């Protein structure tokens, strides 16, 4: 699928979820960067939240946003590592219809260029859930 340069840009509403046991609203730098990049790209922040590394809470938040007609997409930062606390992919498994396997592959390729083989510690992923990506 090629990008059509003639196609009109349509901004969407994006929700940002930070998953962390150690960050709060005052020091959520990853969430802040995502919000800034969403706005710089011309999209709108539809919602923002911070959840602890708890699969039930993450899945509940995602279900609420997926069901919200004002949210077009959700971006999550955190919880994709290899420790026992990292449960974001497992929470996504509870709400997804389909995986988008190429996302994780490209994410790790780009990360490899910066951090080398440490990128294998990331379980970054993307899914489709009831029409929300």
Located regions from the model:
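Non-catalytic beta/alpha edge segments that cap or flank active sites
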Residues: 1-133
């Amino acid at each position: 699928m090629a990008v059509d340069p003639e196609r009109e840009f349509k901004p969407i509403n994006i929700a940002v979820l930070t998953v962390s046991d150690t960050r709060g609203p005052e020091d959520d730098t990853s969430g802040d960067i995502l919000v800034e990049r969403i706005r710089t790209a011309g999209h709108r922040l539809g919602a923002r939240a911070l959840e602890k590394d708890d699969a039930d809470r993450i899945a509940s938040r995602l279900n609420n946003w997926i069901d919200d007609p004002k949210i077009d997409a959700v971006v999550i930062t955190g919880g994709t590592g290899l420790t026992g606390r990292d449960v974001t992919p497992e929470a996504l498994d509870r709400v997804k219809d389909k995986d988008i396997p190429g996302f994780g592959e490209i994410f790790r390729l780009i990360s490899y260029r910066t951090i080398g083989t440490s990128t294998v510690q990331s379980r970054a992923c993307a899914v489709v859930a009831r029409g929300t990506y």
